[in-house]
Amino acid sequence: QXGDLVAAGKKVYRQCHACHSVGEGAKNRVGPEQNNLFGRVAGSLPDFRYSKAMKSAGENGLVWTDKSLHEYLKNPRAYVPKTKMIFAGLKKPEDIDAVVAYLKTFDTDGMPDPDASTYTPPNG
């Protein structure tokens, strides 16, 4: 169920919260804020200092989608070599599915996205 997946994602996202924020009033921290992430070109928030690697990835066509975020969260440094993100990655596919579902619930202003209730993980 999408609601259960989102609730699980909120718990898993606690690992991300030290560096990132999401939701109403989200601000850039060590990592960029993550409202309205899906469809965003990687490295494109104007007021965040990205690594050269992340900016280059975006310039070369990396856009955050369900699939690209799944791959990135598995192993950030393998997906975007030389990224500044120090997190090693999420090992469990179900945790990645949950975080993706959770992040999809936030629109540009950090408010609930009505389309998020239709999210189905690519793995099932």
From Swiss-Prot:
Belongs to the cytochrome c family. Cytochrome c2 is found mainly in purple, non-sulfur, photosynthetic bacteria where it functions as the electron donor to the oxidized bacteriochlorophyll in the photophosphorylation pathway. However, it may also have a role in the respiratory chain and is found in some non-photosynthetic bacteria. Disulfide bonds: none annotated. This is Cytochrome c2. It is found in: Periplasm. The keyword Metal-binding applies. It comes from Afifella marina. GO terms for cellular component: periplasmic space. Its main location: periplasm.
